[in-house]
Amino acid sequence: MGQKVTGGIKTVDMRDPTYRPLKQELQGLDYCKPTRLDLLLDMPPVSYDVQLLHSWNNNDRSLNVFVKEDDKLIFHRHPVAQSTDAIRGKVGYTRGLHVWQITWAMRQRGTHAVVGVATADAPLHSVGYTTLVGNNHESWGWDLGRNRLYHDGKNQPSKTYPAFLEPDETFIVPDSFLVALDMDDGTLSFIVDGQYMGVAFRGLKGKKLYPVVSAVWGHCEIRMRYLNGLDPEPLPLMDLCRRSVRLALGKGRLGEIHALPLPASLKAYLLYQ
């Protein structure tokens, strides 16, 4: 679970007022998932074949990494010293809302572990150990160890993320978390343990952006699993109604839908069947 560390370890629950920002300028930040994102996360994930279409691109990578033959959702980094290496996903997004899961073991992150998005022109290799994603104006990245956001890092200062952190606090990012790219609103956000961390980057509209990570840890393996996407059209009323019913039931009771006095077709609809 995502944790905030000061002198000891505390569990972060974004719904708990204890962890709302203390700084006045952060009070207006919205930590509630947008409606479209909430609906997408309630949908079943796409098939494995579709996940492969959105997976890592073995032809768009640093030479020090490769996509595994036995699991094409995972890439492996060779243990090359004084090198930072990155890889892009196969699909560049220009419209719609897209969510993918990154699985990156905490023990395999090292000093510079960065996750984000990039244009096709962003560099994928650098000599030395550096925050490669976010290093210039072609990429946007979250450094998982430093809890900092980088974009055009050579010219712009980094920002704290999640924004509720105080200067003496560290947020421990778990092995798996979600990345949400909304090309219609032009935002990049992250979800940890089901909790929306707020918008990390804005101003992305009009670009073509690819999932990207940069790594320095030898033999690290990073998995990307595309969950689903939504086109920019208005949300259908039927989908909103289904979401309302599922919310009213709660995740723990979705298995009871079969026992409800409803037509079989409606039960199937509520279960995304």
From Swiss-Prot:
Molecular-function GO terms, alphabetical: ubiquitin-like ligase-substrate adaptor activity
The SOCS box domain, residue ranges: 232-273
Domain of life: Eukaryota
Subcellular location: Cytoplasm; Cytoplasm, Cytosol
Keyword Phosphoprotein recorded: yes
Coiled coil: none
InterPro entries, A to Z: B30.2/SPRY, B30.2/SPRY_sf, ConA-like_dom_sf, FBXO45-Fsn/SPSB_families, SOCS_box, SPRY_dom
Domain B30.2/SPRY intervals: 33-231
Gene Ontology cellular-component annotations: cytosol; SCF ubiquitin ligase complex
Entries under Gene3D superfamilies matching the protein: 2.60.120.920, SOCS box
One Pfam family matching this protein: SPRY
Entry keyword set: Cytoplasm, Phosphoprotein, Ubl conjugation pathway
Residues with PTM Phosphotyrosine: 31
Record-level GO BP terms: proteasome-mediated ubiquitin-dependent protein catabolic process; protein ubiquitination; ubiquitin-dependent protein catabolic process
Pathway: Protein modification; protein ubiquitination
UniProt keyword annotation of Phosphoprotein present: yes
Job of this protein: Substrate recognition component of a SCF-like ECS (Elongin BC-CUL2/5-SOCS-box protein) E3 ubiquitin-protein ligase complex which mediates the ubiquitination and subsequent proteasomal degradation of target proteins. Negatively regulates nitric oxide (NO) production and limits cellular toxicity in activated macrophages by mediating the ubiquitination and proteasomal degradation of NOS2. Acts as a bridge which links NOS2 with the ECS E3 ubiquitin ligase complex components ELOC and CUL5.
Record's subunit section: Component of the probable ECS(SPSB1) E3 ubiquitin-protein ligase complex which contains CUL5, RNF7/RBX2, Elongin BC complex and SPSB1. Interacts with CUL5, RNF7, ELOB and ELOC. Directly interacts with MET tyrosine kinase domain in the presence and in the absence of HGF, however HGF treatment has a positive effect on this interaction. When phosphorylated, interacts with RASA1 without affecting its stability. Interacts (via B30.2/SPRY domain) with PAWR; this interaction is direct and occurs in association with the Elongin BC complex. Interacts with NOS2 and EPHB2.
Family: Belongs to the SPSB family.
Domain remark text: The SOCS box domain mediates the interaction with the Elongin BC complex, an adapter module in different E3 ubiquitin ligase complexes. Essential for its ability to link NOS2 and the ECS E3 ubiquitin ligase complex components ELOC and CUL5.
Name this polypeptide is given: SPRY domain-containing SOCS box protein 1
Source organism of the structure: Bos taurus (Bovine)
